Amino acid sequence: MGIKHYKPTSPGIRQMTRHTFEELTSTRPEKSLLERLTRKAGRNVYGRITVRHRGGGHKRMYRIIDFKRNEFDGIPAKVVSIEYDPNRTCRIAKVVYANGAKRYILHPVGLNVGDTVVSGPDADIKVGNALPLENIPVGTIVHNIELYPGRGGQLVRSAGASAQIMAKEGRYALLRLPSGEQRKVLLACRATVGQVGNLEHENIVIGKAGRKRHLGFRPAVRGVVMNPVDHPHGGGEGRSPIGMPSPVTPWGKPTLGYKTRKPNKKSDRLIVSRRKK
């Protein structure tokens, strides 16, 4: 995998960088693992915007990813291709099990076409293998971590992400997450060995607004240039200050450092140390 730079033939191209996609081995996805993806544009079932700055973008099909890795325990699966997924930052690997079943999994660093992966409690500590945290040694790098046994991986799934098992105590394993947060996770939860691939993703420069629109993002407008009806910072004659001691959100809550986490959240007891600021 690498990054492609361009000659500055236009202002948009000047700083722009792209992936070379040299690690991909297949351009056509597996039809049996595709689903229609309906665009929501940030709206809920009532048609109201619940996530701002979403909409448009290229049409996509959803690739069904096996986040659980518990369907074929002990059955080896061969990696047959590494593919692009428009719905996530990392690449995906198509694996074919010995019984003929096909699945997509997240592609970790070091997993190549022709390699074999296994899931289950007796799997080896090898990149791409998925097993319960109780069977993974302390110090191992993992990704695609479950929060509840059997629910499927929910943590550490984006490009280049990894967590490390720091300790085990009682029913829990202590993990250091990419944010720096140290959190307890049940030992019965599964994780996949290795680091998520596509390490160069963080070095990609979008370069121009049109590329961002192509990805499905709409412009973010500053509150200070809105009208008073649209934002607390809005209004005034010409270029005016926000007119209040500290910035607030469009709904009037303080921002820039204001803590929004619920003070008595259930999972607080599982967080040993919060993320680094």
UniProtKB/Swiss-Prot annotation:
Q: Which domain of life is it from?
A: Bacteria
**Region annotation Disordered: where it falls in the sequence:** 226-277
Q: Which UniProt key words apply to this protein? A: Ribonucleoprotein, Ribosomal protein, RNA-binding, rRNA-binding
The answer, when asked if RNA-binding is one of the entry's keywords, is: yes
Q: Which Pfam families match?
A: Ribosomal_L2, Ribosomal_L2_C
Concerning PROSITE patterns, the annotation shows: RIBOSOMAL_L2
Question: Which InterPro entries did the record assign?
Answer: NA-bd_OB-fold (IPR012340), Rib_uL2_dom2 (IPR014722), Ribosomal_uL2 (IPR002171), Ribosomal_uL2_bac/org-type (IPR005880), Ribosomal_uL2_C (IPR022669), Ribosomal_uL2_CS (IPR022671), Ribosomal_uL2_dom3 (IPR014726), Ribosomal_uL2_RNA-bd_dom (IPR022666)
State how it assembles: Part of the 50S ribosomal subunit. Forms a bridge to the 30S subunit in the 70S ribosome.
Q: Which PANTHER family match?
A: LARGE RIBOSOMAL SUBUNIT PROTEIN UL2M, RIBOSOMAL PROTEIN L2
Which family is annotated? Answer: Belongs to the universal ribosomal protein uL2 family.
HAMAP family recorded: Ribosomal_uL2_B
- The entry's protein name is Large ribosomal subunit protein uL2
